[in-house]
């Protein structure tokens, strides 16, 4: 079962496996959401309150103290918080998916990718709920949204898939080298400041112009989708160059193909004997 299928068919195989087990995935998503929100008094409202409070705090620290004058800055930060949180949670959650669920693998032949996908989809649900936190900002600042806002979910899907794909590459090795989980979590914390959460794409281009540093910055896989989210919601135009989209597209497909291949090839071997 684990070695006869061609490694090159891994992306298609994993997609098919998860479609076949979609009922289980729904139950896992419900389990994760209930575990997080059933106890607290405010329940699912925390999915809105948390990014809202974070955006207000970050806006105060970076906006008032540093001196940002953009009246839409809190909304800009809110979008960055939602996008980055989805990517970071998908990355760190997938990285430890094998170690977190190792006890289940001893008793079932369920494809291991099911747990990674259910975690990613749970993060999607939370991110879509978090978007409602933007409504007060849009009303307060009188921002009129147009039909381009329907593209926002595709940006979120891209962020979650990239984070999950990179996590799939690391997850099998994190079973035998647990320090990798801590390293990834550290990188995620540092990456927050290196990503357009509290700063914007125009700030990046204004700082580095069109030089090599600016081009290399597009290797950060969240820059393009978060910037596009802001453009779609706020009606702005950040002027991302064609090579920026090309670099993100390359990173997206490369990480997805490599992630599914590595996970399909290594996950079972690494888990055996735990």
Where are these regions (language model features)?
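Hydrophobic transmembrane alpha-helices and immediately adjacent juxtamembrane helices
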Residues: 1-274
